[in-house]
Protein backbone atom coordinates (compact mmCIF):
# COMPACT_ATOMS: atom_id res chain seq x y z
CA UNK A 1 0.00 0.00 0.00
CA UNK A 2 1.28 3.48 -0.89
CA UNK A 3 0.83 6.46 1.41
CA UNK A 4 0.81 10.13 0.41
CA UNK A 5 0.72 12.23 3.55
CA UNK A 6 -0.59 15.79 3.64
CA UNK A 7 0.64 18.02 6.47
CA UNK A 8 -2.40 19.65 8.02
CA UNK A 9 -0.76 21.47 10.90
CA UNK A 10 2.81 21.64 12.14
CA UNK A 11 3.43 21.35 15.90
CA UNK A 12 3.41 24.69 17.72
CA UNK A 13 5.52 25.32 20.82
CA UNK A 14 4.36 28.42 22.65
CA UNK A 15 6.28 27.99 25.88
CA UNK A 16 8.69 25.49 27.42
CA UNK A 17 7.44 22.94 29.89
CA UNK A 18 5.39 19.77 30.05
CA UNK A 19 1.96 19.59 28.43
CA UNK A 20 -1.02 17.85 29.95
CA UNK A 21 -0.82 14.10 29.38
CA UNK A 22 -4.42 13.92 28.20
CA UNK A 23 -4.44 17.14 26.21
CA UNK A 24 -5.95 16.54 22.73
CA UNK A 25 -3.54 16.81 19.82
CA UNK A 26 -4.56 18.42 16.54
CA UNK A 27 -4.67 16.22 13.45
CA UNK A 28 -1.31 16.93 11.81
CA UNK A 29 -1.09 14.33 9.03
CA UNK A 30 -3.63 12.77 6.70
CA UNK A 31 -3.18 10.07 4.05
CA UNK A 32 -4.42 11.46 0.72
CA UNK A 33 -2.94 8.85 -1.64
CA UNK A 34 -6.29 7.43 -2.75
CA UNK A 35 -7.93 10.77 -3.47
CA UNK A 36 -4.77 11.94 -5.25
CA UNK A 37 -4.91 8.93 -7.57
CA UNK A 38 -1.77 7.20 -6.28
CA UNK A 39 -2.44 3.49 -5.94
CA UNK A 40 0.23 0.81 -5.85
CA UNK A 41 0.92 -2.35 -3.87
CA UNK A 42 4.61 -3.28 -3.77
CA UNK A 43 5.07 -7.04 -4.20
CA UNK A 44 8.44 -8.67 -3.71
CA UNK A 45 9.36 -12.33 -3.39
CA UNK A 46 7.30 -15.21 -2.02
CA UNK A 47 4.64 -14.36 0.55
CA UNK A 48 6.34 -16.28 3.35
CA UNK A 49 6.44 -15.04 6.92
CA UNK A 50 10.15 -15.74 7.20
CA UNK A 51 11.41 -14.45 3.86
CA UNK A 52 13.14 -11.11 4.31
CA UNK A 53 12.38 -9.76 0.83
CA UNK A 54 8.65 -9.00 1.31
CA UNK A 55 9.56 -6.88 4.36
CA UNK A 56 11.64 -4.46 2.28
CA UNK A 57 9.57 -1.60 0.91
CA UNK A 58 10.52 0.38 -2.21
CA UNK A 59 11.96 3.85 -2.42
CA UNK A 60 10.43 6.79 -4.27
CA UNK A 61 11.72 9.53 -6.53
CA UNK A 62 10.13 12.94 -7.03
CA UNK A 63 10.93 15.07 -10.06
CA UNK A 64 9.45 17.00 -12.98
CA UNK A 65 9.84 14.23 -15.54
CA UNK A 66 7.69 15.83 -18.26
CA UNK A 67 8.87 19.45 -17.98
CA UNK A 68 5.50 21.00 -17.15
CA UNK A 69 6.64 22.61 -13.89
CA UNK A 70 4.89 20.13 -11.60
CA UNK A 71 6.72 17.51 -9.54
CA UNK A 72 5.83 13.95 -10.56
CA UNK A 73 6.26 10.72 -8.57
CA UNK A 74 8.09 7.52 -9.52
CA UNK A 75 7.53 4.36 -7.45
CA UNK A 76 9.70 1.31 -8.23
CA UNK A 77 7.91 -2.03 -8.15
CA UNK A 78 9.25 -5.30 -6.81
CA UNK A 79 9.76 -8.54 -8.70
CA UNK A 80 6.24 -9.68 -7.79
CA UNK A 81 5.21 -13.13 -6.67
CA UNK A 82 6.81 -16.21 -8.30
CA UNK A 83 3.46 -17.32 -9.77
CA UNK A 84 2.61 -13.88 -11.25
CA UNK A 85 3.58 -11.98 -14.37
CA UNK A 86 6.09 -9.13 -13.83
CA UNK A 87 4.57 -5.94 -12.48
CA UNK A 88 5.38 -2.52 -13.99
CA UNK A 89 7.24 0.27 -12.27
CA UNK A 90 4.85 3.15 -11.67
CA UNK A 91 5.10 6.75 -12.83
CA UNK A 92 2.43 9.21 -11.69
CA UNK A 93 2.20 12.53 -13.54
CA UNK A 94 1.25 15.52 -11.41
CA UNK A 95 -1.81 17.20 -12.95
CA UNK A 96 -1.32 20.40 -10.97
CA UNK A 97 -4.54 20.16 -8.97
CA UNK A 98 -3.45 17.79 -6.21
CA UNK A 99 -4.13 14.68 -8.29
CA UNK A 100 -1.91 12.37 -10.33
CA UNK A 101 -2.34 10.40 -13.55
CA UNK A 102 -0.81 6.93 -13.86
CA UNK A 103 1.28 6.99 -17.05
CA UNK A 104 3.26 3.82 -16.30
CA UNK A 105 2.09 2.03 -19.44
CA UNK A 106 3.67 4.62 -21.77
CA UNK A 107 6.70 5.66 -19.68
CA UNK A 108 9.02 2.95 -21.00
CA UNK A 109 10.30 1.97 -17.55
CA UNK A 110 9.52 -1.73 -17.75
CA UNK A 111 9.11 -3.86 -14.64
CA UNK A 112 9.87 -7.17 -13.03
CA UNK A 113 12.93 -5.83 -11.22
CA UNK A 114 13.39 -6.42 -7.50
CA UNK A 115 13.77 -2.70 -6.82
CA UNK A 116 14.55 -1.23 -3.42
CA UNK A 117 15.55 2.37 -4.15
CA UNK A 118 15.31 5.06 -6.83
CA UNK A 119 17.02 8.32 -7.69
CA UNK A 120 16.06 11.07 -10.15
CA UNK A 121 19.06 13.05 -11.42
CA UNK A 122 20.45 14.52 -14.65
CA UNK A 123 23.21 12.10 -15.68
CA UNK A 124 24.15 13.55 -19.07
CA UNK A 125 23.61 17.27 -18.47
CA UNK A 126 20.83 17.66 -21.04
CA UNK A 127 18.42 19.24 -18.55
CA UNK A 128 16.16 16.15 -18.45
CA UNK A 129 15.78 13.99 -15.35
CA UNK A 130 17.04 10.43 -15.61
CA UNK A 131 16.30 7.50 -13.26
CA UNK A 132 18.53 5.02 -11.44
CA UNK A 133 16.92 1.97 -9.83
CA UNK A 134 18.71 0.14 -7.00
CA UNK A 135 17.74 -3.53 -7.32
CA UNK A 136 18.39 -6.98 -5.96
CA UNK A 137 20.41 -8.21 -8.91
CA UNK A 138 21.43 -5.96 -11.79
CA UNK A 139 20.58 -2.28 -11.26
CA UNK A 140 18.60 -0.39 -13.92
CA UNK A 141 19.28 3.01 -15.48
CA UNK A 142 16.93 5.01 -17.69
CA UNK A 143 17.59 8.21 -19.64
CA UNK A 144 14.72 10.69 -19.61
CA UNK A 145 13.29 12.13 -22.81
CA UNK A 146 11.84 15.16 -21.02
CA UNK A 147 8.21 14.29 -21.80
CA UNK A 148 7.50 11.62 -19.18
CA UNK A 149 9.01 8.79 -21.21
CA UNK A 150 12.37 7.03 -20.84
CA UNK A 151 14.77 4.78 -22.71
CA UNK A 152 16.68 1.94 -21.10
CA UNK A 153 20.40 2.66 -20.75
CA UNK A 154 21.26 -0.01 -18.18
CA UNK A 155 24.07 -1.27 -20.40
CA UNK A 156 26.05 1.85 -19.43
CA UNK A 157 26.41 0.54 -15.86
CA UNK A 158 29.26 -1.77 -14.80
CA UNK A 159 27.88 -5.34 -14.65
CA UNK A 160 26.98 -6.52 -11.14
CA UNK A 161 24.73 -9.08 -9.53
CA UNK A 162 24.46 -7.68 -6.00
CA UNK A 163 21.65 -6.30 -3.81
CA UNK A 164 21.50 -2.51 -4.00
CA UNK A 165 19.66 -0.67 -1.23
CA UNK A 166 19.91 3.02 -2.14
CA UNK A 167 21.74 5.48 -4.36
CA UNK A 168 22.73 9.15 -4.10
CA UNK A 169 24.34 11.60 -6.53
CA UNK A 170 27.07 14.23 -6.11
CA UNK A 171 29.96 15.61 -8.14
CA UNK A 172 32.71 14.20 -5.93
CA UNK A 173 35.52 14.84 -8.45
CA UNK A 174 34.30 18.34 -9.37
CA UNK A 175 34.34 17.73 -13.11
CA UNK A 176 30.86 19.14 -13.67
CA UNK A 177 28.77 15.96 -13.82
CA UNK A 178 27.01 13.87 -11.19
CA UNK A 179 28.59 10.69 -9.87
CA UNK A 180 26.72 7.96 -7.98
CA UNK A 181 27.27 6.19 -4.66
CA UNK A 182 25.35 2.92 -4.49
CA UNK A 183 24.94 1.20 -1.12
CA UNK A 184 24.66 -2.59 -1.08
CA UNK A 185 22.77 -4.78 1.34
CA UNK A 186 23.68 -8.43 2.00
CA UNK A 187 24.37 -11.89 0.59
CA UNK A 188 20.91 -13.32 1.07
CA UNK A 189 20.32 -17.04 0.62
CA UNK A 190 16.63 -18.04 0.92
CA UNK A 191 17.65 -21.69 0.91
CA UNK A 192 18.65 -21.24 4.55
CA UNK A 193 15.07 -20.47 5.57
CA UNK A 194 12.99 -23.09 7.43
CA UNK A 195 10.50 -25.08 5.33
CA UNK A 196 7.28 -23.29 4.42
CA UNK A 197 5.34 -25.84 6.47
CA UNK A 198 7.07 -24.56 9.62
CA UNK A 199 6.65 -20.85 8.94
CA UNK A 200 3.37 -20.54 10.83
CA UNK A 201 4.98 -21.65 14.07
CA UNK A 202 7.84 -19.18 13.96
CA UNK A 203 7.97 -15.89 15.81
CA UNK A 204 9.74 -12.75 14.67
CA UNK A 205 12.09 -12.90 17.67
CA UNK A 206 13.24 -16.45 16.91
CA UNK A 207 16.97 -16.62 16.00
CA UNK A 208 16.45 -17.58 12.37
CA UNK A 209 18.56 -16.95 9.27
CA UNK A 210 16.11 -14.27 8.10
CA UNK A 211 17.84 -11.77 10.39
CA UNK A 212 20.01 -9.41 8.29
CA UNK A 213 23.05 -9.50 10.56
CA UNK A 214 23.42 -13.25 10.02
CA UNK A 215 24.25 -12.67 6.34
CA UNK A 216 27.53 -11.15 5.10
CA UNK A 217 27.39 -7.62 3.73
CA UNK A 218 28.18 -6.59 0.17
CA UNK A 219 30.62 -3.91 -1.05
CA UNK A 220 29.27 -0.50 -2.04
CA UNK A 221 29.96 1.16 -5.39
CA UNK A 222 31.15 4.64 -6.31
CA UNK A 223 30.24 5.11 -9.96
CA UNK A 224 32.30 7.89 -11.51
CA UNK A 225 30.46 9.63 -14.32
CA UNK A 226 32.76 9.54 -17.36
CA UNK A 227 30.65 11.87 -19.52
CA UNK A 228 32.82 13.32 -22.30
CA UNK A 229 31.82 14.99 -25.55
CA UNK A 230 28.22 13.84 -25.11
CA UNK A 231 29.13 10.18 -24.51
CA UNK A 232 27.97 8.83 -21.15
CA UNK A 233 29.52 6.01 -19.14
CA UNK A 234 30.27 4.98 -15.56
CA UNK A 235 33.32 3.42 -13.87
CA UNK A 236 33.34 1.84 -10.40
CA UNK A 237 36.16 3.50 -8.41
CA UNK A 238 35.03 2.53 -4.89
CA UNK A 239 37.91 0.13 -4.19
CA UNK A 240 40.45 2.52 -5.70
CA UNK A 241 39.29 5.31 -3.38
CA UNK A 242 38.73 3.08 -0.35
CA UNK A 243 34.98 3.66 -0.02
CA UNK A 244 33.60 0.22 -0.93
CA UNK A 245 33.02 -0.72 2.76
CA UNK A 246 32.42 -4.45 2.15
CA UNK A 247 31.36 -5.49 5.67
CA UNK A 248 28.38 -3.22 6.27
CA UNK A 249 24.77 -3.43 5.14
PLM region descriptions:
Residues 1-249:
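Acidic, glycine/proline-rich Ca2+-coordinating loop motifs
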